[in-house]
Structures are given as structure tokens and as C-alpha cells.
From Swiss-Prot:
SUPFAM superfamilies, per the entry: Tubby C-terminal domain-like (SSF54518)
Short name of one Pfam family: LOR
Task performed by this protein: Might be related to the phospholipid scramblase and tubby-like superfamily of membrane tethered transcription factors.
Family: Belongs to the LOR family.
This protein's name: Protein LURP-one-related 4
Length: 215
């Protein structure tokens, strides 16, 4: 059974024997649609997502020509849920028709981080950092598989929250890494909703206390 992140040299357009750097623009090329566009170091579009939305239960990762490489499906579990990743299964209507190649869920042992478990039961981690969209993907030994951080100009100026730099180590399937970046974007959307809910609850308590004092 294939690993999510194979380490052997493989002839694939989605892997390289060298470290690769991509620019991720958290926007769609299609007018007025949510999405994500990924450029390689030559400025060429390599991946795109046109139905990216924090409310989406299904998201497709495509190549430049619109061929579906991965499908992300969300399984709702209270506020957070978990995400299942399927290879080239955009035509499937039921998750029971094919097994996922990876599952992503909130870690039960690493607070604030997310667990990635592949079809061979190998575990990876998505480790978040202080900036809104900065994180690393590491293996069980702590080796960095890929990392994402805000993109900066040659003068060190951050280009914006929706423009990112993605670095992928050699012999890693960068199409799947882009898929995990997409999942993390969905996760950050959910986290934002949770924060808003907590802020609202705190405001409700504060208002209630104030009224009680006035009475």
C-alpha cells in the first residue's frame, strides 16, 4: 500500500529530487469564487481549487487543466470535524466507494495541532505557529516534510495574509501537501467560527452580569 509521503525516488510530476518552493495565493482565478492558486518557482500555475470555502463539505484539488487530483470530504463532529482525503475520486458520490488515503483530525495529545494519518496508519503532524497561516508538517520523528509561512518580498515586506510561501522537501508528493494546505485553510475557518462563538458567549455573560448588578 502506498505511503502518503514516499521517501524513495519516484518518477512523478508531483515529486522532485530537490527541495521545491511554491507560492500559494489563497484566491481563485475564477471571478467571484472562493479558491486557491499555487505557482511554482517559475511562476507557472501548478494547482488550483475553485470551490474552496470554510462551509464546503467537499473540495477538489486540481491541476492547471482542471483534472481532479484529490477530493477532500468533511465529516462533521461538533464544531471541528475531521477531513478525509481521496485520490482522484471526484466522480465518486459516496465515500464508501473508495478508501481515503489520509485522514486529518484535531490531535488529542498535542494541543492546537492536527494529526494526519495515512492509509498505512503512519502518523504526521500539522504544527501551527503564531501567524494566522504559518505551520509545518512533520513526521513521527520530528523531521520537517513541508512548511508554510507568509510570503515576503526581497525587501522583507510581508505581501499579505493570503499570499504564502510553501517549501517542500525532496521526494515528497507536493500535490498532497497542497491538499493539506487546503485542509488547514478549512480548519482555520472553523477555528475562526469557534473563536467568534466563544467571544459571543463571553459578551453574553458580561451583559448578563451587568443587568444583574443594575437590578
Amino acid at each position: 500500500m502506498a505511503r502518503v509521503f514516499p521517501q524513495a525516488a519516484i518518477s512523478s510530476p508531483y515529486m522532485s529530487t530537490e527541495r521545491e518552493t511554491f507560492t500559494v495565493w489563497m484566491k481563485s482565478l475564477v471571478y467571484q469564487t472562493n479558491g486557491l492558486t499555487v505557482y511554482n518557482s517559475n511562476g507557472e500555475i501548478t494547482y488550483r481549487v475553485e470551490n474552496y470555502d470554510k462551509c464546503s463539505n467537499e473540495v477538489h484539488i486540481m491541476d492547471l487543466h482542471g483534472n481532479i487530483l484529490f477530493t477532500i470530504r468533511k465529516k462533521k463532529l461538533w464544531l471541528f470535524g475531521s477531513w478525509y482525503v481521496y485520490r482522484e475520486c471526484g466522480s465518486f458520490t459516496s465515500t464508501e466507494e473508495v478508501k481515503p488515503c489520509a485522514r486529518i483530525k484535531r490531535s488529542s495529545i498535542r494541543d492546537g495541532d492536527w494529526e494526519v494519518r495515512d492509509e498505512t496508519n503512519e502518523v504526521f503532524w500539522i504544527l501551527r505557529f503564531d501567524p494566522k497561516f504559518a505551520f509545518q508538517i512533520i513526521d513521527i520523528h520530528g523531521n520537517i516534510i513541508a512548511q508554510v509561512k507568509p510570503k515576503q518580498s526581497s525587501n522583507g515586506i510581508t505581501l499579505g495574509e493570503d499570499v504564502l510561501t510553501l517549501e517542500v522537501k525532496p521526494r515528497v508528493d507536493h500535490s498532497l501537501v497542497v491538499t493539506l494546505v487546503t485542509v488547514y485553510g478549512l480548519i482555520k475557518g472553523i477555528d475562526g467560527e469557534v473563536k467568534q462563538l466563544r467571544d459571543f458567549e463571553e459578551e453574553e455573560v458580561a451583559v448578563g452580569d451587568e443587568i444583574a448588578i443594575e437590578i
